Each structure stands twice: as C-alpha cells, then as structure tokens.
C-alpha cells in the first residue's frame, strides 16, 4: 500500500532525473532530462548523437551497461552513423567486473589500448558531487529545475573542473 502512495505522490513530477555525458577531464558535455521513466536507451542514444555531431570521429563512451548499449546503438537508426564515425562503447572500470569474462575482454576499459589509466567513472564522481542539488530542485517547476541544473553545471565546469586542470 505504501509503495502505491509513494508512486502516486511522485507521479505528479515529469522529470525524474538527468542523464549526462562527462569527458575524461570532468566537464559536463551534454545533459538530458529523464521524463517519467528510468534509464531507457533513448537517453544515451540522444547523448551519443549529440556528441558525434559535436566532436566527430573516434569517440568512446563508458557506460555501466556499455556492452548492452553497443548492441542497442548498432541496431538503432543511429548505428550506421556511429560506425561511420568509429564510435566505441565501453564498460566502466568498476562496473565491468560484474560482467562475464568475454564481455570484459571486449568492452572493459582496462583492456582497451590507448585509454591509459582512465576508469570512465566521471559520471559517478559528478553525481556524487551534485547530490546537494537534488533537494533544491525536488519541488521546482520544470523551468526552475533546468535553470538550477544548468547553473550548477556551468559553475562546475568553469570554477571546479577548468580551474583544477592545471593542478
């Protein structure tokens, strides 16, 4: 009974979270509102499309379920475009060890030449840093929620990430 009440209570809000792309330096590159759904394939597909258009060839993206997303991406209408631009889907370092060995050898960041010590866990670090944003946007209008999130990530990029690049 209590679960039904909770679902109804939170059901009045359309936005349930954000899906972000973070570069290896920690800059927020793209954000998408998740609307009345959990993590669905449409969010990373939209982000990949945006990044391919902005940055072009030879991009790689780490995702907790990068192995599954690789299949989704290749079967989508974006698949041909992603293959043409040599996009690679990878599994983040800490999540990859839950996958089977063949998946790890093919997708785990540890085994990909050229990535160095990158763990592709920038989104996890960013979400950890941005946890204080959630209570301030919980009851906001859609406009004010987007405004607060945009301001947070502008501040994050300019005054935290950019300022710390030279350290």
Regions found by a protein language model. Give the residues of each.
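Catalytic-core elements of nucleic-acid end-processing and repair enzymes
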Residues: 1-167
């Amino acid at each position: 009974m209590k679960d039904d009440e909770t679902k109804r209570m939170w059901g009045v809000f359309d936005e349930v979270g954000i899906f972000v792309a973070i570069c290896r330096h920690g800059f927020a590159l793209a954000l998408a509102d998740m609307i009345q759904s959990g993590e669905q394939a449409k969010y990373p597909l939209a982000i990949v499309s945006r990044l391919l258009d902005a940055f072009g060839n030879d991009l790689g993206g780490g995702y907790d379920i990068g192995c599954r997303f690789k299949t989704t991406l290749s079967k989508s209408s974006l698949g041909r475009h992603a293959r043409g631009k040599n996009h690679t889907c990878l599994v983040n370092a800490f999540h990859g060890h839950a996958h089977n060995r063949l998946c790890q050898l093919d997708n785990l960041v540890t085994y990909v030449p050229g990535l160095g010590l990158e763990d592709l866990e920038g989104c996890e670090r960013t979400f950890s840093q941005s946890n204080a944003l959630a209570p301030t946007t919980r009851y906001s209008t859609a406009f004010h929620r987007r405004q607060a999130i945009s301001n947070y990530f502008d501040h994050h990029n300019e005054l935290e990430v950019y300022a710390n690049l030279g350290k």
